Amino acid sequence: MSHVRGLGLPGCLALAALVSLVHSQHVFLAPQQALSLLQRVRRANSGFLEELRKGNLERECVEEQCSYEEAFEALESPQDTDVFWAKYTVCDSVRKPRETFMDCLEGRCAMDLGVNYLGTVNVTHTGIQCQLWRSRYPHKPEINSTTHPGADLKENFCRNPDSSTTGPWCYTTDPTVRREECSVPVCGQEGRTTVVMTPRSGGSKDNLSPPLGQCLTERGRLYQGNLAVTTLGSPCLPWNSLPAKTLSKYQDFDPEVKLVENFCRNPDWDEEGAWCYVAGQPGDFEYCNLNYCEEAVGEENYDVDESIAGRTTDAEFHTFFNEKTFGLGEADCGLRPLFEKKSLKDTTEKELLDSYIDGRIVEGWDAEKGIAPWQVMLFRKSPQELLCGASLISDRWVLTAAHCILYPPWDKNFTENDLLVRIGKHSRTRYERNVEKISMLEKIYVHPRYNWRENLDRDIALLKLKKPVPFSDYIHPVCLPDKQTVTSLLRAGYKGRVTGWGNLRETWTTNINEIQPSVLQVVNLPIVERPVCKASTRIRITDNMFCAGFKVNDTKRGDACEGDSGGPFVMKSPFNNRWYQMGIVSWGEGCDRKGKYGFYTHVFRLKRWIQKVIDQFG
């Protein structure tokens, strides 16, 4: 008898409320209203009671048929009762055998539309991996855990939150297929599934290097084959034709690479591989489809004698671009007017330099004014909104991510007339008079081999400004790295810096002001080993990408987030005090999730493409 309790104050209040309502004109209560009055107050020590409730539920509703009120008596929560009752009514038609009934109640199989399904199938009926319900990549879901809180939208498991007539489904990781049904077992019908499995041909693509002996080293610099057609199917122009000879005259070609007939070659050591000139506008070129070995630049190719601690690297800066087409700024790039030019350091750059010697912004902090004078805001004209980040590389050219311009799954296909750039900004929303410059775009150039369909490979685009932008304390270009700088700095454990006005955290909140910063944010992130990057995701990683972020056991946190895309990942060289843009914020699976990292476009890998475009159209 020791567990028997009196009614107590909560019970008295409930009884008083009930008596009051009975004596009023509303003699009968709605079922939900009555149940809410009779609901018992939960106690902290409820382990025994939880077991008792489970026993009651099984006795009342599994061994026998029960009513909504009886289920509520066992569960004591309107929300839990509603969820249970929805499954119970669906599963009632398969009460026997008991095992099938329990499988249905516990969601291990689908009944009717499969609204009850809570299993772990996470591939569609054609074999496509499901997208995480909490993710916005590759598709922005209109259904999520906030819009459908009772639908058990966990991980990337197939569910039917909208009662689709085709059964459980999921958003897919294929950018060309938004959502697709899953093949899940049907309750009480052994061997039958909601839809038939019909795997697509081709299978999955694993993060594997090309087989040894079947790939070209040095990005095809030594290729002597007879391929004379580009990836896009265009025939190559002969190297000794007048257009090709005219264009080659001022190029820094390797004399050891023999330019024979119209065969694809790589005379300028383009990290993209072999290419050729093609007919069309003067200077048109295209890349050729050859199989290149994966060869890391920086990261694994590390020479201890050229380490930061050894200080043996040449500190002299050499320009790379033709000023006539590139514009002004390269000779002075990466030297910030308010810091390096005044021999001052910002508050956190020591963290970067220490990491060199020692071996989307979430959890970032407000940036000091002028800390990233190359930061650009890519702005949509109508509706007026921040679209992406970008970076200033000269007074005429801006660098950003291709997916900021073109990404069909999000209905993105912007032209020069849709966008403008805002340069020199610190505040996210306020117009900064006499500081920021607003510039129109003359032309957008997206990498021709940008792969939005699979993995955002070559996620890079160039924006040509209509007019050169004047430099100031708050407007100054960043440097693009050479091979020596990449080899010295792009090392696992070394930290780079990401800046942007992106979301402060990953969330589905409708109050956007809760997650958007008022000023530019900055975060310093360590580069991650390539095998760890590959192991962290099912998406195929190429050597045009690298990843950065904190590992599960690291005490510090931080990441880029939605809105930071297209912005720069920069590192400061201790040899010449210049800042170099090593990467472009490209993609990630959420923001600052444990075991997940941000992926960045490898700028050096695509530097020759940048040069060719600028030489042709500058």
From Swiss-Prot:
Activity is promoted in the presence of negatively charged surfaces, such as polyphosphate and dextran sulfate. Inhibited by SERPINA5. It is an enzyme of class 3 (hydrolase). The gamma-carboxyglutamyl residues, which bind calcium ions, result from the carboxylation of glutamyl residues by a microsomal enzyme, the vitamin K-dependent carboxylase. The modified residues are necessary for the calcium-dependent interaction with a negatively charged phospholipid surface, which is essential for the conversion of prothrombin to thrombin. In the penultimate step of the coagulation cascade, prothrombin is converted to thrombin by the prothrombinase complex composed of factor Xa (F10), cofactor Va (F5), and phospholipids. This activation requires factor Xa-catalyzed sequential cleavage at 2 sites, Arg-311 and Arg-360, along 2 possible pathways. In the first pathway, the first cleavage occurs at Arg-311, leading to the formation of the inactive intermediate prethrombin-2. This pathway preferentially occurs on platelets and in the absence of cofactor Va. The modification 4-carboxyglutamate is found at E50, E51, E58, E60, E63, E64, E69, E70, E73, E76. Residues 44-90 form the Gla domain. The keyword Calcium applies. Keywords: Acute phase, Blood coagulation, Calcium, Cleavage on pair of basic residues, Disulfide bond, Gamma-carboxyglutamic acid, Glycoprotein, Hemostasis, Hydrolase, Kringle, Protease, Repeat, Serine protease, Signal, Zymogen. Its EC number is 3.4.21.5. Glycans are attached at N122, N144, N413, N553. Residues 1-24 form the signal peptide. Residues 25-43 form a propeptide. It catalyses: Selective cleavage of Arg-|-Gly bonds in fibrinogen to form fibrin and release fibrinopeptides A and B. Thrombin can itself cleave the N-terminal fragment (fragment 1) of the prothrombin, prior to its activation by factor Xa. This is Prothrombin. It comes from Mus musculus (Mouse). The gene is F2.
